[in-house]
């Protein structure tokens, strides 16, 4: 069967609404790509997409009147004269198989692997987290998630407590538990993230050691030995009083979701209470880690 593809550029704020409308008017699938043509495959809702602009790609039956589709988008103000778009015929493929073929087991640090459920585990003796990609954020494909996973792998988490602030898919909390943490807490503003984290924890056999809270429902006295927050620079600075108070004395803090150009301003917010390590960078993103000062 032949297909026709519509590709248009959008802001992150509009991409979800455009996707929903495209499905309403007949798209058989809608996917997102970042500006480097990298699929934004992430496992279930729960975290903020970190790309500034997103290409929305819709697949239609070849018989679809694409000019009518364009007119409908224009009528809904999803497409205007300043929006670039492209329509093209594409060859028939096994799209589900091609999607699955994009994902392979990934290694982070010395011990940790993230593996889709349909792939063979590369190393039975390693720490293996089974996680299937969906359309949210947090499988390890983004540099910030990778940086966080590598940091967790570098720590001795044996018997430690961990808080994953902005847990999304739960990937960081689950990885920490598999790496030896005694217990973990996941916190998020999105109920779907809480559900996704629980389901992923169950799949990995660690659900009984993971507590999950919506942000407004977390205990007021909650603290942990290790706190990790992979969100965005703005919220990290705004939520500094809350995040910093989650760390136990002499505890470890890891922050990501930060562009390298934003690192100094985030460090400035946290350096009064934490002794910070050298910043770790990857592509245009970075990770900030440190230890709570004993005199605080």
Swiss-Prot record:
InterPro entries: Ribosomal_L11_MeTrfase_PrmA (IPR050078), Ribosomal_PrmA_MeTrfase (IPR004498), SAM-dependent_MTases_sf (IPR029063). It catalyses: L-lysyl-[protein] + 3 S-adenosyl-L-methionine = N(6),N(6),N(6)-trimethyl-L-lysyl-[protein] + 3 S-adenosyl-L-homocysteine + 3 H(+). GO terms for molecular function: protein-lysine N-methyltransferase activity. Signal peptide: none annotated. It is found in: Cytoplasm. Pfam families: PrmA. The keyword Cytoplasm applies. Belongs to the methyltransferase superfamily. PrmA family. This is Ribosomal protein L11 methyltransferase.
């Amino acid at each position: 069967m032949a297909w026709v593809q519509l590709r248009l550029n959008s802001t992150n704020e509009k991409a979800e609404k455009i996707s929903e409308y495209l499905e309403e008017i007949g798209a058989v699938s809608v996917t997102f790509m970042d500006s480097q043509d990298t699929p934004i495959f992430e496992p279930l809702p729960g975290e903020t997409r970190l790309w500034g602009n997103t290409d929305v790609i819709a697949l239609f039956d070849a018989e679809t009147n694409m000019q009518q589709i364009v007119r409908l988008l224009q009528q809904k103000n999803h497409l205007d004269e300043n929006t670039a778009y492209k329509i093209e015929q594409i060859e028939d493929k096994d799209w589900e198989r091609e999607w699955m073929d994009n994902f392979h087991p990934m290694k982070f640090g010395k011990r940790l692997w993230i593996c889709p459920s349909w792939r063979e585990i590369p190393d039975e003796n390693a720490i293996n987290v089974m996680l299937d990609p969906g359309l949210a954020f947090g499988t390890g494909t983004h540099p910030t998630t990778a940086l966080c996973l590598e940091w967790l792998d570098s720590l001795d988490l044996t018997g430690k407590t961990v808080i994953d602030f902005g847990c999304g898919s739960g990937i960081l909390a689950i990885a920490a538990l598999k790496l030896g943490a005694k217990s973990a807490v996941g916190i998020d503003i999105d109920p779907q993230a809480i559900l996704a984290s629980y389901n992923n924890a169950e799949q990995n056999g660690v659900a009984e050691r993971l507590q999950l809270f919506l942000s407004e429902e977390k205990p007021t006295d909650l603290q942990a030995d290790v706190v990790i927050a992979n969100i965005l620079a703005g919220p990290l600075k705004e939520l500094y009083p809350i995040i910093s108070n989650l760390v136990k004395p002499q505890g470890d803090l890891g922050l990501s979701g930060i562009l390298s150009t934003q690192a100094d301003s985030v460090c400035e917010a946290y350096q009064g209470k934490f002794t910070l390590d050298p910043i770790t960078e990857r592509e245009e993103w970075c990770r900030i880690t440190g230890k709570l000062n004993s005199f605080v």
